[in-house]
Curated annotation (Swiss-Prot):
UniProt site positions, description: Transition state stabilizer: 167
UniProt name for this protein: Aldehyde dehydrogenase 1
Pathway of action: Sesquiterpene biosynthesis
Family: Belongs to the aldehyde dehydrogenase family.
Pfam families per record: Aldedh
Record field: pH dependence: Optimum pH is 8.5.
EC number of the protein: 1.2.1.-
Source organism per UniProt: Artemisia annua (Sweet wormwood)
Function: Involved in the biosynthesis of the antimalarial endoperoxide artemisinin. Catalyzes the NAD(P)-dependent oxidation of artemisinin precursors, artemisinic and dihydroartemisinic aldehydes, thus producing artemisinic and dihydroartemisinic acids, respectively. Can use both NAD and NADP as proton donors.
PROSITE patterns for the chain: ALDEHYDE_DEHYDR_CYS, ALDEHYDE_DEHYDR_GLU
Residues binding NAD(+): 164-166, 190-193, 223, 243-248, 266, 397-399
Assembly, per entry: Homotetramer.
Gene that specifies this protein: ALDH1
Keyword NAD: yes
Active-site feature positions: 266, 300
Length: 499
């Protein structure tokens, strides 16, 4: 493991441009005047003081979004016109990639290289993908059984509340905002309190792109105040949320108790990554590392339960151990860095607590498991073996750099154990046997099965969960469906030569 994980001086000198709320096309202070600090997780230093929105600010933002939806141009302009603005937005994201990447690094502890070369380009391409759908939203002509002609209209659902997580603000902004814009919706966005800066900058870019005032509104704040106000607001027509299962339940309850607004939830996971005896061991070990330590393990789809068939267990663990020890922890701006700090102090403490639970419950700590460096929320990449299904580290989502290896014997056994979880977000299968692939992929109760790979996410591939990992789909044209309603229009016809 490499040294030098004390953060970068770049954050101290970087000028933060936007710290207020973004409502009706303008950056404004919160009504109360309250603020909060956002922290650089690599240095534990205050980056900026940000306006704190509460219920009254959400009300103001919803009022702007409602006016923009009911009387503004966005839902009424042609799909082609919306497409052109969204493509301009995508271009502006690319033109400001360095700024967006820097904000992701200093505000969220993410790594400069992966964000600059993957997450930001994927974000802009997500806008391009859904821009391409904006002028292709159409209804259908219906074959009625009587002298009636009918057709369907697909109309935007209205004002949407987006509650965005802290583990990938730019990517999640694009994932939620792009399809909603394509559909013709207006929206209020509540970024995570730990990472508001990227979302505020993206709001600025939306104005430059020509998105009309009131269509995109951003209210920084805390979940129990601003987030709760979004979930329970009587004039928000739909809510999307990405985050923990516990908070997702709260969001769903608030939506039901207010105006019965629909919700789309992408929640927690405890995904199985299954390695069979005939697998390419080197490839499987490589993807097990990527599937758990990418973004410091702060991924809902992390394949943190690595099931290894007994015939290759010891060899696989040895390869995994070497790869974990080589996973370089350094300054997030260093392009050679593979591992950065956890996003915030609360998450840092939670991960360390889970590691301690693993040791107390009898799992074997092979490597890692300790804080790293003198400053910042760094935790060594961690590998446990001799893990059993009843241990906390095998049951609960950790959302950190911790791999648990579990041994299995048969296909039937591993399917049963892989499904013995309240979650169902993703999974991985490594084998050369197509029959095993077919059996396992049809048996695993999860929203994705990645065969001989992992993290195969793409804007054209619908992503979402089974069970307590939520419902609804993001990415793919299926995501657009959440933001559209179907209206049937029927009129009688008289003396028609045919029906």
């Amino acid at each position: 493991m490499s040294s030098g994980a004390n953060g970068s001086s770049k954050s101290a000198s970087h000028k933060i441009k936007f710290t207020k709320l973004f409502i009706n096309g303008e950056f404004v202070d919160s009504i109360s005047g309250n603020t909060f600090d956002t922290i650089n997780p690599a240095t534990e230093e205050v980056l900026a003081t940000v306006a704190e929105g509460r219920k009254e600010d959400i009300d103001l933002a919803v009022k702007a979004a409602r006016e923009a939806f009911d009387n503004g141009p966005w839902p009424r302009m042609s799909g082609e016109a919306r497409r052109k603005i969204m493509l301009k937005f995508a271009d502006l994201i690319d033109e400001n990639a360095d700024e967006l990447t820097t904000l992701e690094v200093i505000d969220g502890g993410k790594l400069f290289g992966p964000v600059r070369h993957f997450e930001v380009p994927v974000s802009s391409d997500t806008f391009r993908y859904f821009a391409g759908a904006a002028d292709k939203i159409r209804g259908a002509t219906l074959k009625m059984s009587s002298n009636i002609q009918a057709y369907t209209l697909r109309e935007p659902i209205g004002v949407v509340g987006h509650i965005i997580p802290w583990n990938g603000p730019a990517f999640m902004f694009a994932t939620k905002v792009a399809p909603a814009l394509a559909a013709g919706c207006t929206m209020v966005i509540k970024p995570a309190e730990h990472t508001p800066l990227t979302v505020l900058f993206l709001a600025h870019l939306s104005k430059l792109a020509g998105v009309p005032d009131g269509v995109i509104n951003v209210v920084n704040g805390f979940g129990k105040t601003a987030g709760a106000a979004v979930s329970s607001h009587m004039d928000i027509d739909m809510v999307t949320f990405t985050g923990s299962t516990e908070v997702g339940r709260t969001v769903m309850q608030a939506a039901a108790l207010s105006n019965l607004k629909p919700v789309s939830l992408e929640l927690g996971g405890k995904s199985p990554l299954i390695v069979f005896d005939d697998a390419d061991v080197d490839k499987a070990a490589e993807f097990a590392i990527l599937g758990n330590f990418t973004n410091k393990g702060e991924m809902c789809v992390a394949g943190s339960r690595v099931f290894v068939q007994e015939g290759i267990h010891d060899v696989f663990v040895k390869k995994l151990e070497g790869a974990v020890k080589a996973w370089a922890t350094r300054d997030p701006f260093d392009l050679a860095t593979r591992h950065g700090p956890q996003n915030n102090k609360q998450q840092y403490d939670k991960v360390l607590s889970c590691i301690n639970h693993g040791k107390k419950e009898g799992a074997t700590l092979v490597t890692g498991g300790k804080p790293f460096g003198k400053k910042g929320y760094y935790i060594e990449p961690t590998l446990f073996t001799n893990v059993t299904d009843d241990m906390t580290i095998a049951k609960e989502e950790i959302f950190g750099p911790v791999i648990s290896v579990l041994k299995f014997k048969t296909v039937e056994e591993v399917i049963k154990r892989a499904n013995a979880t309240k979650y169902g977000l993703a999974s991985g299968v490594f084998t050369k046997n197509i029959d095993v692939v077919n059996t396992v992929s049809r048996s695993i109760r999860a929203g994705a099965v990645w065969v001989n790979c992992y993290l195969a996410l793409d804007r054209d591939a619908p992503h979402g969960g089974y069970k307590m990992s939520g419902f609804g789909r993001e990415q793919g044209l299926e995501a657009l469906e959440h933001y559209l309603q179907i209206k049937t229009v029927a009129t009688p016809i008289y003396d028609s030569p045919w029906l």
